[in-house]
C-alpha cells in the first residue's frame, strides 16, 4: 500500500491523505517524479489521474507528508499528456519525447522529433494528444508539440502536428510559427490545450514586453487554430490583429485549461516581481501587460499605469508574492468529489500544488495540497 499525506495550507480545506489499496509502484514512481520536480506541464492532471488509477481514497489525516520515491528521474521534464489510461507522453526540454508505461515504469524514446533550440528556457516544451474516441489503437492519435525553433541566432515558438505509429511520429509538419523571432531565449509560453474543434496555444512576449501590445505580432498572446492548423474565420477581427490571435497582453502564460462547465479557456501567467495572474480568456480581449500589472519591476518600482486601465480585462485571481505558476487543470470526476469544479495549479517557485477554490465560477481562495 502506498500512502501519501497531503497537508494543505491552513484553511477550511483541512488536511487530506491519499491512500491507495492497489500495488502500482511503477506508476507511483512517475507520480512522485512529477510532484518532486514540479515540471511545467500537466502536473495536476498526472497527479489526479495517476492517483485515481491507483485506487485512491480521501480520508482525514494530520500526519506530515510521507512520499516514497521509486525509480530514476527525468531531466528537465516540461510537458505531458495521456495517450490512453496506461501510457503518458512526457517531454524533456533538451529535445526528448518519451512514452511512459505507468503500470511497468518502462519508457520508450519516440523518434522523428523536430530539432529544437534548447537553451535557457527554450527547447521541447509542451505535448498535447488528440485521441480518436472511436478507436483503441494508439496510432489513431494526433500529437501536437510546442517548442522553440532555431532560426540562425534567433528562436521562435513553433507547433508541429503529427501522427503516431507506436514508436515514431509520422507525417509531422509545422502548423504554426510565431512571427516574433528574437535572440532572447525566455518567455516562450508554449502551453497547448484542445477543445472539440480548436487548438489553443499560449505565447510569451519573449522578454520584449512592449511586443505584447503590438497587434501585428504573436508575442504575448493566446492563438487559436483549428485542429488541422488552419485559422478559424471567427477569430477576433480587432484592428490590425494577426489572424491567429485570440487574446493579447500576456507576459509569459504557462497554464491553459478548458473549464468543463462552460467550455471557456482559462489561463495563468507569470508576473514579474509579484502579480502572477489567472485570467478567463475572452475573444479579442487585452489583458494588459505591460500597460498594467499587479507586480513590480525586479529592481523595484511600478510597471505601467497601475493595476487597471480602460480597455484592459482584469484578472480573476492574483498571487503576490509570485508563486511562478506552471500547469493548470480543472478537476472533474467521482474519485475526489470535494475537488469537483475547482482548479489545480502548480508552483515552480515553491514546489507546490495549489487548489484554487471556485464559487459561482470565480476563484475565492487557495490552499496548498502538495508542498516540497
Residues covered by each model-derived region:
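Bacterial N-terminal signal peptides
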Residues: 45-57
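Short, charged, low-hydrophobicity "junction" segments
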Residues: 58, 170-178, 297-304
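Acidic, Gly/Ser/Thr-rich repeat motifs that build Ca2+-stabilized beta-propeller blades
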Residues: 62-209, 255-258, 263-271, 321-363
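N-terminal non-cleavable signal-anchor helices
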Residues: 3, 29-36, 57-60, 101, ...
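Beta-propeller domain segments
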Residues: 122-124, 132-136, 205-371
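The N-terminal extracellular segments of secreted preproproteins, especially immediately downstream
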Residues: 29-31, 46, 184
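N-terminal secretory signal peptides that target proteins for export/translocation
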Residues: 1-41
Amino acid at each position: 500500500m502506498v500512502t501519501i499525506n497531503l497537508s494543505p495550507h491552513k484553511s477550511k480545506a483541512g488536511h487530506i491523505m491519499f491512500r491507495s489499496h492497489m500495488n502500482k509502484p511503477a506508476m507511483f514512481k512517475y507520480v512522485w517524479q512529477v510532484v518532486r520536480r514540479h515540471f511545467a506541464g500537466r502536473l495536476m492532471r498526472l497527479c489526479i489521474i495517476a492517483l485515481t488509477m491507483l485506487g485512491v481514497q480521501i480520508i482525514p489525516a494530520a500526519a506530515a507528508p510521507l512520499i516514497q520515491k521509486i525509480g530514476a528521474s527525468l531531466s528537465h521534464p516540461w510537458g505531458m499528456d495521456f495517450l490512453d489510461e496506461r501510457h503518458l507522453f512526457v517531454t524533456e526540454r533538451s529535445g526528448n519525447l518519451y512514452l511512459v508505461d505507468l503500470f511497468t515504469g518502462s519508457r520508450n524514446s519516440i523518434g522523428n522529433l523536430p530539432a529544437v533550440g534548447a537553451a535557457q528556457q527554450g527547447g521541447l516544451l509542451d505535448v498535447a494528444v488528440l485521441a480518436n474516441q472511436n478507436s483503441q489503437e494508439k496510432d489513431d492519435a494526433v500529437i501536437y508539440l510546442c517548442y522553440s525553433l532555431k532560426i540562425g541566432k534567433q528562436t521562435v515558438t513553433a507547433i508541429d502536428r503529427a501522427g503516431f505509429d507506436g514508436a515514431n511520429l509520422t507525417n509531422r509538419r509545422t502548423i504554426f510559427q510565431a512571427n516574433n523571432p528574437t535572440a532572447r531565449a525566455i518567455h516562450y509560453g508554449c502551453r497547448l490545450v484542445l477543445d472539440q474543434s480548436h487548438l489553443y496555444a499560449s505565447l510569451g512576449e519573449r522578454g520584449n514586453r512592449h511586443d505584447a501590445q503590438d497587434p501585428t505580432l504573436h508575442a504575448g498572446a493566446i492563438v487559436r487554430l483549428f485542429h488541422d492548423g488552419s485559422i478559424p474565420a471567427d477569430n477576433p477581427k480587432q484592428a490590425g490583429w494577426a489572424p491567429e490571435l485570440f487574446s493579447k497582453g500576456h507576459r509569459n502564460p504557462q497554464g491553459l485549461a478548458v473549464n468543463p462547465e462552460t467550455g471557456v479557456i482559462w489561463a495563468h501567467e507569470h508576473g514579474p516581481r509579484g502579480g502572477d495572474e489567472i485570467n478567463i480568456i475572452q475573444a479579442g480581449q487585452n489583458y494588459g501587460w505591460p500597460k498594467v500589472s499587479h507586480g513590480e519591476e525586479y529592481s523595484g518600482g511600478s510597471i505601467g499605469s497601475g493595476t487597471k486601465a480602460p480597455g484592459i480585462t482584469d484578472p480573476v485571481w492574483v498571487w503576490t508574492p509570485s508563486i511562478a505558476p506552471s500547469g493548470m487543470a480543472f478537476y472533474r470526476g467521482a474519485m475526489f468529489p470535494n475537488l469537483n469544479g475547482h482548479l489545480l495549479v502548480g508552483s515552480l517557485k515553491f514546489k507546490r500544488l495549489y487548489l484554487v477554490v471556485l464559487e459561482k465560477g470565480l476563484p475565492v481562495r487557495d490552499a496548498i495540497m502538495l508542498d516540497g
